[in-house]
Structure formats: structure tokens, C-alpha cells
């Protein structure tokens, strides 16, 4: 039996999911207190799910399950204070303990995450699941890209345990699950809600979490895939070291990152970003829509393409809105793989703006 195949099946949740999840701070196992259940359609089968619950660490920390999704950010008890005040009688006392004992940690995560969460939530809110492509790729192209980046095949995915760190709209997770893999998608923003609600494959599972505080058991996954996410955190290197801990021995880590470019247009974009990324999101939205979008749409149209305005807006938001955007030479990233005892390190794809690199985690001697 796959450890967490029936993640949201009520009858198996305590058996299959809880051994995988961990408190992101203490790494202790979590205990579940169910508040209410609901229904979700997987394929043609309506399944009972846990829609509201609270997860308790062995000491101090507690995390809500809201709308069927475990909210496992360090600061989730703040983000979902209204929910917790309603369902946890001693919420005030518990939260005061956390503020007193972990003041510096909480200040750190709030500072580094607040703008990033809002930026990517706003970005993916633009995505139309019925009409839009994901980064100009349809479902077939998305799957082909994933296989090329990871060096896997359709056949090799069967029964694999995969962690998609920064899953965005969640469409790729659904496609991978359809090949017989069990995949856990994690995202830092509330975009995870649409990913979960639009998913119809029971093998694709979703949690909200922070790449620098992964709320899962260490050394568990066959493949950890992190595409275009590390470079949007406050420290690419630190995030790399945090996420690689989730890879099992002989497992694979796959990361996609930006590389430096030496052309004046790219450098101009980076300079513009220094200004736009600091603006309120609502101002950014109209700036891109009214000033940046029309010429970009015209350029695409003159090239014979058929651009969708929402897709172009999403691309503009991804380029100019995130607080952090780092670029790294392949040799630098390769050194991180080496530090963490990975072998068979190779670049699997090279593109205009970035590249994908994979490595196999060696067994400890």
C-alpha cells in the first residue's frame, strides 16, 4: 500500500497521511482532531474527506486543516486565527505561548513570506483552468517537459512517491498521478485551494507549506521536483538545502533555476523589477495590464502567435511581481548538490531564461 495514496479518504487518513506529515518547526509527528467532514469527487466516485480539523505537534505548535487542506506554514496559526478561535477554545493561550517562545522565528517567516504569498496567490488567481495553458504549454506539453526535466519516463513514474514543491495551479500533479504515481503538491500561497478543488485524481494530494520549513518526513520521496521556485525565495541556496532533505537515499532531486543573461533587454527588465516588485499588488496589476500588456500582445500577434491576455498577464506577474528573483550559474548549483552528497549530477534542459538540473542522492557510508 502506498503510504499516503488515500490522503483525503477519511477511513485511512490517520493510517496513511499522519506518518508522513511533520511539524515544520520541531519535525515531530502530528496528531489529528477532526472537526467536520465533507464530500469530494474523484473521477466518478464521491469520497468522504476531512474538511476541517486541527493538527497538533508534540509540543506547542498546532495547524488547521481548512477546506480539506492542511495549512502547515509556521505562521498558519496567525493566518487562520478566525478559524482557530472558533474551533479551539484555548487558542489565545496557545498562540501567546508561540509568540513568547518563538518571537524571532515568527518575525522571520512573516517578513520573508507575506509578500510572496500575496504575489503568487494573485498571480494564479488569473489562471482559467478551462481556457488557459500553463506557461504556454498544454497538458501533453506539460507532461513532456516534466519527463525531460526529471529524466523519467511514463513507465518509470508508476508507484513513485513524488514531492512537487511549489505546485502552482496543480495541473501537473493531476497529470503525474494519472500515470500511477502518488504526488504531494505543496505551495506557499492560497492558490493551493484552487489546485485542490480542481483536482479529480486521488493520487494527487495537496498541502500548504514553506519550502524552507518542509512539513513532511525527511528522506521519504523518490523524486523531489522544484521548478522555478527556489529562485523566488529569500535564499536559493538555503531553500535548496531545506528541500533536498526530503529526498530518500538513491532518490532524485530536480530543480529549475534562472541563469544570468548578458543582454541589455534582460538587464533593463531586472532594473524595472526593482521598482515594480515593491508596489502594492493592485497598482502592479493595472500597471502591467494598461502599460506592459498591450505592446507584449502586439509583439506576439505580429509573430503569428495567438496570445491569450490572461496568460500574458500571468507571465508579466511572474516576471515583475515576486519580491525575490535570483539567477545562478550551473557550476554554483552543482556545488550544492556535491555538498549534500549527490551523484550523477547533470543539466537535463537548457532554455532561454534557465535550466533544469538533477542529481541522485548517494547512500550514506
Question: Residues of each region from the PLM?
Answer:
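Short alpha-helix
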Residues: 324-340
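A short glycine-rich, Lys/Arg-flanked "PGG" loop and its adjoining helix->strand segment in the class I
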Residues: 237-249
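Conserved beta-strand signature within the Rossmann-like core of class I S-adenosyl-L-methionine
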Residues: 250-258
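A short linear hydrophobic-aromatic micro-motif
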Residues: 343-347
Amino acid at each position: 500500500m502506498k503510504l499516503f495514496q488515500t490522503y483525503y479518504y477519511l477511513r485511512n487518513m490517520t493510517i496513511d497521511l499522519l506518518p508522513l506529515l511533520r511539524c515544520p518547526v520541531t519535525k515531530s509527528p502530528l496528531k489529528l482532531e477532526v472537526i467536520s467532514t465533507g464530500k469530494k469527487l474523484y473521477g466518478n466516485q464521491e469520497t468522504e474527506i476531512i474538511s476541517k480539523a486541527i493538527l497538533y505537534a508534540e509540543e506547542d505548535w498546532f495547524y488547521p486543516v481548512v477546506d480539506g487542506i492542511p495549512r502547515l506554514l509556521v505562521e498558519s496559526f496567525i493566518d487562520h486565527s478566525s478559524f482557530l478561535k472558533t474551533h479551539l477554545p484555548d487558542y489565545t493561550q496557545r498562540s501567546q505561548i508561540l509568540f513568547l517562545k518563538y518571537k524571532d522565528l515568527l518575525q522571520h517567516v512573516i517578513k520573508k513570506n507575506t509578500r510572496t504569498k500575496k504575489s503568487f496567490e494573485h498571480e494564479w488567481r488569473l489562471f482559467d483552468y478551462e481556457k488557459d495553458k500553463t506557461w504556454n504549454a498544454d497538458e501533453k506539453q506539460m507532461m513532456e517537459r516534466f519527463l525531460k526535466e526529471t529524466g523519467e519516463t511514463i513507465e518509470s513514474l508508476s508507484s513513485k512517491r513524488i514531492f512537487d514543491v511549489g505546485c502552482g495551479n496543480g495541473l501537473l500533479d493531476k497529470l503525474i498521478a494519472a500515470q500511477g504515481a502518488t504526488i504531494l503538491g505543496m505551495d506557499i500561497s492560497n492558490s493551493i485551494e484552487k489546485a485542490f478543488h480542481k483536482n479529480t485524481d486521488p493520487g494527487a494530494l495537496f498541502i500548504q507549506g514553506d519550502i524552507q520549513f518542509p512539513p513532511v518526513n525527511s528522506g521519504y520521496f523518490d523524486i523531489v521536483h522544484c521548478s522555478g521556485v527556489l529562485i523566488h525565495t529569500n535564499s536559493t541556496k538555503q531553500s535548496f538545502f531545506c528541500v533536498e532533505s526530503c529526498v530518500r537515499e538513491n532518490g532524485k532531486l530536480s530543480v529549475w533555476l534562472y541563469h544570468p543573461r548578458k543582454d541589455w533587454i534582460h538587464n533593463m527588465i531586472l532594473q524595472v523589477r526593482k521598482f515594480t516588485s515593491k508596489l502594492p499588488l493592485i497598482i502592479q496589476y493595472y500597471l502591467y495590464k494598461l502599460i506592459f500588456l498591450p505592446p507584449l500582445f502586439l509583439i506576439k500577434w505580429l509573430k503569428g502567435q495567438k496570445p491569450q491576455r490572461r496568460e500574458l498577464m500571468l507571465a508579466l506577474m511572474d516576471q515583475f511581481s515576486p519580491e525575490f528573483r535570483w539567477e545562478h550559474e550551473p557550476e554554483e548549483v552543482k556545488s550544492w548538490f556535491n555538498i549534500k552528497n549527490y551523484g550523477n549530477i547533470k543539466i537535463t534542459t537548457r532554455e532561454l531564461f534557465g535550466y533544469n538540473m538533477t542529481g541522485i542522492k548517494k547512500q550514506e557510508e
